């Protein structure tokens, strides 16, 4: 005979099979009993499979296997006489619906006892009424009440009926129960004894239908006619024989918790088969309906339709047609606009923290507490022992001559007129936004439209950007259009002294050429040397401080020589090389020549080097001066020409050992200088008054006004126009602004000639001093201020300050009034301020900028001691030490101060050390594609264009590209969108982006790809942008800040407060990241972080071990511990070991005997004579 263990084993297999489709084993155990019930009422495996599909998407093979297991269990149950309650995992009767497994804590409310005995009286009256009717109604009510209270812990909801339970009802055999009493539970014994006690009295019948009589008595304990509350007998019970029960009918009186299904008889069923089919469909629908609320696999599953089996094709067609009619029909333009707005709304919700970005984990335990503290402790290598990072105070190198002078004080205060106008515009804007009816219900009725919508429609029209050829045509004068290139050359002042100049060049290795702007020294010197044959021994190189100048001059010289650009004459700038094997005249930026010196220390391929515009004293120019001075001592056959204005030519001559100076006479007209009688407190107000006074009282002639920046220029133009409109019958005036961030097509307007009878006024920055020449200028208004970028080595930030100009700048500005005729220069400061409060020359860039890249280049050139390098103007010592320390922290220098392998790779990229390290580290993380895109975007000016009249629309367009956790990723996002739109100019205009700047970034990216291919660095891409943020942290960990308070950050190492700019993607978030890194820190009105990315503190400790260590404190309900992640012990040990090794080497070197070597005299070879010398 089969054992009870086999039945348990089969039931366990059934549970294991169901576990594959359930979320947990408990759910499978609960489902197993329901599946057994379905199997008992199923006549075939197909019917069982259809019923099983309501619990989940079971496969057909698994359904057949489950059906076989259920039949085996049912067979064992029949043979062993084990009830379903006795099966494993079942403590009571299994029913569908909600089952309370643990009800020990639930107890029914005890009936309140009446103090007046009314409850006893009510029971007696009910008993009397039942005796009159001949029925024991009271006993039935009491039994129901007792059973409902006693079985409260077995509360079960109604289970959907089995479609076959009415037609199939297995009877239990008494013999099977008696033979296996050892397996019976207490409940089974109680029910068996009750059944035995009732069988003798309740199953006796004259016609032999004992079972039917029993069921009638048990199912109809009450009369079908009962009185209602009004005493009549119209209330009837439904025929209880129509009740449906399952196969495991619990014999006994009904309780108030029994599951009853009322079936109402149909009026006229067609046939018994139709009724059976209808009952099966109803049972199936009931099961689908109830199971739809189960939490197994259908909760939240909106795709599954439990009534799909009963739908007809016509129903589905009607439903699809109805859904299609409900859809909102949109045009293609409206659909694109709706999609764009949806993306913006989703981005805003993610940014504000209302919704989560996809793929972010949010699982955490409420009982878990984790705190991470970032500890800061700077380490220093031994080669910097004794070096004072702050040996000089920050104020030693200042941009003003006298901090207490009137010019310095007014520069710090700024313009009061501009400040008041800014505040007034903000108040006006807020008031108009508050009182605007556009977009409201009343505004819609009145037909008012939002001005931003109209601006948006106007902004969709692409703006045509003028090319260089178009701009050059606009700049052509009548003289240039009527004269040939030969005649134009002969008209220049430099052509008149051609022979004398060549004679001095032949006799001297170094020559300082002094000439005013427009004398022709830039374009003619290289042609003079070419015509004299210097190109036969090597190329003639000409350096320019700006790349635009190098490109334009090369184009002009190639046109004058009648050759194609890139053949005989070419140019080379960073990330762009337009030269060929036949190029003999090469124009380039000074940085390009500095990079070439890394490959060729002696510059062998050049015979003559011309350093143009050296008076601007750029950083690379000063470094080249020191390098060329050494090259000249090693090569006697190379010549150096340094062109400069009259301002500091003597300093260049002294640096090169008293080199001769050659002056090219200028062709400028006399300029009268007019100083102010008293200092002016507001330079914008004074400039506006002076322009109006010139326009109303002076003869014809255009006006040039020098201002500090974009905001001052725009305010000056608006105020001049407003005040001129207040005058009656005032002469016409054309007001044109120009600054670096203005689009090229708008910049070209200043070169257009004004209409007859109209005076032109140009308001510009110091870009109009040397870079641009505007014809027709007769009056110059000099405010005496400019914006200068200063580097604070103690804080490691660049500050953009409004500072007084130098005397050399003032003379250069005044000279702009005498290009076409006599002019007047109005200086809005006193003559004493010019003499006492201004420097003679502008502060060199090498003394006010970060020198990390410069030091890296010098180390690559073999300069061991940076302090011993021959600088024309020595940079501050603290700046040099800070640059060396930064390179050591980045891994470019070792503990001895020598270049590492990483540092050599970094020096090959023409960019800042941090950006170079980004590309190198990206190879290890396989994200070079994304990193070089970010680096190229960081290497160009801002790509955003924000016109003052459409500022809000520009800001809204910028927000569409925001990435909540990173501004670096925002730049990557912009470039990728531009790339997907085919590098379209119209797309850039629509989204307020500089197409020219983006194209420049694309060229830089292509050049980086070529450099990487030479270094054998592969291009790879990743989809996880967290990896990109991790790589960014590896290069910018020294520029990190942590959150403090609300909306404020502090620098981790210096403790200086930092702020997010309003244009940052992180600004306006619903939360502030704890730790961020930034690209640069700019000090204007506040300390603003530019290009910010949120990072993890563990990343900072991983890559910046010289600065940071992480202390983690963890607590939950089971454990608590503190952990510290730090690489400081290993770094300290390595620094100490290297310090001891260096000390031993120095001691051994000092103890070595000095060996005297015989000096050998080497006779220098005379330089070769070239034809024409």
From Swiss-Prot:
Tell me, in one coarse class, where this protein mainly resides.
Answer: nucleus
The Basic residues compositionally biased stretches are 1156-1173
Q: Which domain of life is it from?
A: Eukaryota
What are the BP-aspect GO terms? generation of catalytic spliceosome for second transesterification step; mRNA cis splicing, via spliceosome; mRNA splicing, via spliceosome
The similarity comment for this entry is: Belongs to the DEAD box helicase family. DEAH subfamily. PRP16 sub-subfamily.
Motif DEAH box, which positions?
A: 612-615
Q: Does the record carry ATP-binding as a key word?
A: yes
Species: Schizosaccharomyces pombe (strain 972 / ATCC 24843)
Q: What class of enzyme is it?
A: hydrolase
Q: Which Gene3D superfamilies match?
A: 1.20.120.1080, P-loop containing nucleotide triphosphate hydrolases
Catalysed conversion reaction: ATP + H2O = ADP + phosphate + H(+)
Q: Which InterPro entries does the annotation name?
A: DEAD-box_helicase_OB_fold, DEAD/DEAH_box_helicase_dom, DNA/RNA_helicase_DEAH_CS, HA2_WH, Helicase-assoc_dom, Helicase_ATP-bd, Helicase_C-like, P-loop_NTPase
Q: Where is the composition biased (Basic and acidic residues)?
A: 153-165, 175-191, 234-248, 270-279
Q: Where in the cell is it found?
A: Nucleus
Record protein name field: Pre-mRNA-splicing factor ATP-dependent RNA helicase prp16
Keywords, A to Z, come to:
ATP-binding, Helicase, Hydrolase, mRNA processing, mRNA splicing, Nucleotide-binding, Nucleus
Cellular component per GO, a single term: nucleus
What is the phylogenetic placement of the source species in the record? Eukaryota, Fungi, Dikarya, Ascomycota, Taphrinomycotina
The record lists ATP as bound by 515-522
Question: What CDD domains does its record include?
Answer: SF2_C_RHA
Please explain the role this protein plays, according to its UniProt record: Probable ATP-binding RNA helicase involved in pre-mRNA splicing.
GO MF terms on file?
3'-5' RNA helicase activity; ATP binding; ATP hydrolysis activity; RNA binding
Q: Where is the Helicase C-terminal domain?
A: 687-862
> Which Enzyme Commission numbers does its entry carry?
3.6.4.13
Domain (Helicase ATP-binding): residue spans on this chain: 502-665
Biased segments, Low complexity type = 193-209
């Amino acid at each position: 005979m089969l054992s009870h263990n086999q039945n348990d084993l089969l039931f366990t297999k059934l549970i294991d099979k169901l576990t594959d489709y359930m979320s947990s084993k408990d759910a499978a155990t609960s489902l197993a009993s329901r599946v057994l019930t379905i199997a008992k009422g199923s006549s075939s495996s197909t019917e069982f499979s259809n019923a099983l599909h309501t619990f989940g998407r079971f496969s057909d093979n698994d359904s057949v296997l489950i059906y076989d297991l259920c039949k085996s269990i049912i067979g064992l149950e029949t043979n062993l006489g084990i009830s379903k309650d006795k099966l494993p995992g079942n403590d009571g009767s299994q029913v569908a619906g909600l089952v309370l497994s643990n009800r020990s804590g639930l107890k029914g409310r005890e009936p309140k006892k009446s103090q007046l005995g009314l409850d006893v009286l009510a029971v007696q009256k009910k008993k009397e009424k039942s005796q009159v009717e001949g029925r024991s109604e009271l006993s039935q009510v009491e039994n129901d009440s007792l059973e409902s209270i006693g079985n409260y812990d077995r509360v079960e909801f109604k289970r959907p009926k089995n479609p076959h339970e009415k037609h199939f009802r297995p009877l239990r055999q008494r013999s099977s129960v008696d033979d296996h009493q050892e397996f019976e539970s207490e409940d089974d014994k109680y029910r068996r004894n009750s059944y035995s006690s009732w069988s003798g009295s309740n199953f006796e019948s004259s016609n032999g239908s004992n079972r039917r009589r029993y069921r009638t008595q048990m199912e109809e304990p009450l009369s079908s006619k009962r009185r209602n509350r009004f005493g009549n007998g119209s209330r009837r019970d439904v025929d209880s024989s129509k009740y449906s029960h399952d196969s495991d009918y619990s014999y006994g009186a009904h309780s108030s918790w029994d599951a009853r299904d009322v079936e109402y008889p149909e009026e006229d069923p067609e046939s018994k088969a139709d009724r059976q089919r209808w009952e099966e469909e109803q049972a199936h629908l009931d099961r689908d309906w109830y199971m739809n609320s189960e939490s197994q696999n259908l909760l939240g599953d909106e795709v599954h339709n439990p009534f799909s089996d009963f739908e007809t094709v016509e129903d589905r067609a009607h439903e699809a047609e109805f859904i299609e009619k409900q859809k909102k029909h949109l045009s293609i333009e409206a659909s694109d606009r709706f999609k764009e707005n949806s993306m913006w709304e989703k981005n805003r919700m993610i940014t504000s923290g209302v919704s989560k970005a996809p793929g972010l984990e949010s699982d955490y335990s409420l009982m878990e507490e984790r705190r991470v503290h970032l500890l800061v402790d700077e380490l220093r290598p031994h080669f910097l022992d004794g070096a004072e990072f702050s040996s000089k105070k920050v104020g030693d190198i200042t941009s003003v001559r006298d901090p207490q002078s009137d010019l310095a004080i007014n520069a710090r205060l700024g313009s009061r007129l501009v400040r008041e106008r800014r505040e007034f515009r903000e108040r006006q804007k807020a008031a108009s936004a508050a009182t605007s009816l556009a977009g409201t219900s009343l505004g819609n009725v009145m037909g008012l439209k939002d001005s931003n919508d109209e601006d948006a429609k106007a902004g969709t029209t692409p703006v045509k950007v003028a090319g260089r050829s178009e701009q050059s045509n606009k700049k052509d004068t009548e003289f240039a259009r009527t004269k040939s290139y030969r005649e134009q050359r002969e008209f220049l002042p430099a052509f008149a002294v051609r022979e004398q100049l060549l004679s001095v060049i032949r006799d001297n290795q170094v020559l300082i050429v002094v000439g005013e702007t427009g004398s022709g020294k830039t374009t003619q010197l290289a042609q003079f040397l070419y015509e004299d044959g210097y190109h036969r021994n090597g190329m003639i190189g000409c350096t320019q401080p700006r790349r635009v100048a190098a490109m334009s001059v090369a184009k002009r010289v190639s046109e004058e020589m009648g050759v194609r650009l890139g053949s005989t004459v070419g140019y080379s700038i960073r990330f762009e090389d337009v030269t060929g094997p036949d190029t003999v005249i090469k124009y380039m930026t000074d940085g390009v020549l500095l990079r070439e010196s890394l490959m060729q220390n002696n510059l062998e391929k050049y015979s003559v080097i011309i350093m143009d515009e050296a008076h601007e004293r750029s950083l690379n120019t000063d470094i080249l001066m020191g390098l060329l001075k050494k090259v000249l001592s090693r090569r006697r056959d190379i010549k150096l020409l340094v062109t400069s204005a009259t301002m500091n030519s003597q300093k260049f001559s002294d640096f090169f050992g008293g080199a001769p100076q050659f002056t090219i006479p200028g062709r400028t007209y006399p300029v009268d200088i007019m100083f102010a009688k008293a200092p002016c407190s507001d330079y914008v107000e004074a400039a506006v008054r002076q322009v109006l006074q010139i326009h109303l009282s002076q003869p014809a002639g255009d006006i040039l006004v020098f201002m500090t920046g974009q905001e001052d220029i725009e305010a000056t133009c608006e105020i001049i126009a407003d005040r001129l409109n207040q005058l009656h019958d005032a002469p016409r005036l054309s007001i044109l602004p120009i600054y670096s961030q203005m689009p090229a097509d708008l910049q070209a307007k200043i070169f257009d000639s004004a209409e007859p009878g109209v005076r032109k006024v140009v308001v510009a920055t110091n870009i109009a001093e040397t870079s641009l020449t505007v014809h027709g200028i007769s009056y110059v208004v000099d405010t005496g201020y400019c914006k200068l970028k200063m580097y604070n080595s103690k804080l490691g930030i660049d500050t953009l300050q409004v500072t007084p100009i130098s005397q050399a700048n003032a003379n250069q500005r005044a000279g702009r009034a005498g290009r076409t005729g006599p002019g007047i220069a109005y200086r809005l400061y006193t003559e004493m301020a010019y003499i006492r409060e201004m420097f003679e020359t502008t502060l060199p860039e090498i003394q006010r900028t970060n020198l990390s890249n410069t030091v890296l280049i010098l180390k690559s050139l073999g300069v061991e001691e940076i302090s011993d390098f021959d600088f024309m103007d020595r940079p501050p010592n603290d700046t040099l030490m800070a640059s060396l320390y930064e390179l050591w922290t980045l891994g470019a220098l070792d503990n001895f101060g020598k270049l590492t392998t990483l540092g050599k790779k970094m020096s090959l990229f023409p960019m800042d050390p941090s950006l170079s390290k980004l590309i190198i580290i990206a190879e290890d993380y396989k994200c070079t594609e994304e990193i070089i895109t970010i680096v190229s975007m960081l290497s160009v000016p801002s790509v955003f264009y924000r016109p003052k009249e459409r500022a809000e629309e520009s800001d809204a367009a910028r927000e569409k590209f925001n990435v909540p956790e990173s501004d670096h990723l925002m730049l990557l996002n912009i470039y990728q969108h531009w790339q997907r739109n085919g590098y379209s100019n119209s797309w850039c205009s629509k989204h307020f982006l500089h197409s020219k700047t983006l194209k420049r970034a694309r060229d830089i990216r292509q050049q980086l790809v070529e450099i990487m291919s030479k270094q054998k660095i592969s291009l790879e891409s990743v989809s996880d942008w967290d990896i990109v943020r991790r790589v960014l942290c590896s290069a910018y960990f020294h520029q990190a800040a942590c959150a403090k308070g609300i909306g404020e950050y502090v620098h981790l190492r210096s403790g200086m407060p930092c702020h997010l700019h309003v244009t940052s993607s992180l600004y306006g978030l619903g939360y502030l990241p704890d730790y961020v890194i930034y690209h640069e820190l700019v000090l204007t009105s506040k300390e603003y972080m530019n290009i910010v990315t949120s990072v993890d503190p563990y990343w900072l400790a991983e890559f910046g071990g010289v600065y940071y260590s992480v202390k983690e404190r963890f607590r939950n309900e089971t454990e608590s511990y503190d952990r510290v992640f730090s690489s400081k012990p290993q770094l300290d040990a390595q620094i100490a070991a290297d310090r001891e090794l260096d000390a031993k080497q120095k001691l051994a070197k000092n103890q070595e005997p000095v060996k005297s070597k015989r000096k050998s005299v080497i006779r220098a070879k005379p330089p070769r004579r070239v034809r024409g010398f």
